[in-house]
Swiss-Prot record:
Keyword Protease attached: yes
Active site: 106, 131
Subcellular location: Cytoplasm
Entry-linked PANTHER family: ATP-DEPENDENT CLP PROTEASE PROTEOLYTIC SUBUNIT
UniProt protein name: ATP-dependent Clp protease proteolytic subunit
Matches recorded under PROSITE patterns: CLP_PROTEASE_HIS (PS00382)
Purpose of the protein: Cleaves peptides in various proteins in a process that requires ATP hydrolysis. Has a chymotrypsin-like activity. Plays a major role in the degradation of misfolded proteins.
Family matches, as Pfam families: CLP_protease
Amino acid sequence: MRDPVETYMNLVPMVVEQTNRGERAYDIFSRLLKERIIFVTGPVEDGMSTLIVAQLLFLEAENPKKEISMYINSPGGVVTSGLAIYDTMQFIRPPVSTLCTGQAASMGSLLLAAGEKDMRFSLPNSRIMVHQPSGGFQGQATDIMLHAQEILNLKKRLNEIYVKHTGQSYQAIEDALERDNFLTAEKARDFGIVDKVIDKRPEDPVAKAA
């Protein structure tokens, strides 16, 4: 029997758009990509990471100056996959705004913090969680030592990224990430992961004037 959740996730809504050549149907995510909106949803892993990186590069090629909006609802996942997205966000020329909807945990919180300064947002009932990287390995003692050292190196690198984007001291970041640390949207704002908690979309000044 198929997992009902998996079945639901595969039912991507279609939207129809009128063009001068007639009607054209898009899946909802492709239509939102036209508006420069990218969704980071579910576990962060290699396949998902590759799709996000490809979308970022495509939108940069389309317009290297126009803002990209990234909506995040993720429990985190593979560190290297998350860092591929992070590095691409920093590499491309367009500013990337981030918005947490639901949760941004582990690597999800790092991507949330990595948005353009003053363009990092959270909805009021979102949950943010930060912690140090974890991993497991079995094999010869020497190999286990090598992998343990690599995890420590990753921990240091991730701490430095949080320092860069939150403005916190290295010690404060190390203390905060020692265990699973759950933050409300307001606490994430105070910690520097987001810049603002919003419950309404800001009014368009052009529409307001009209």
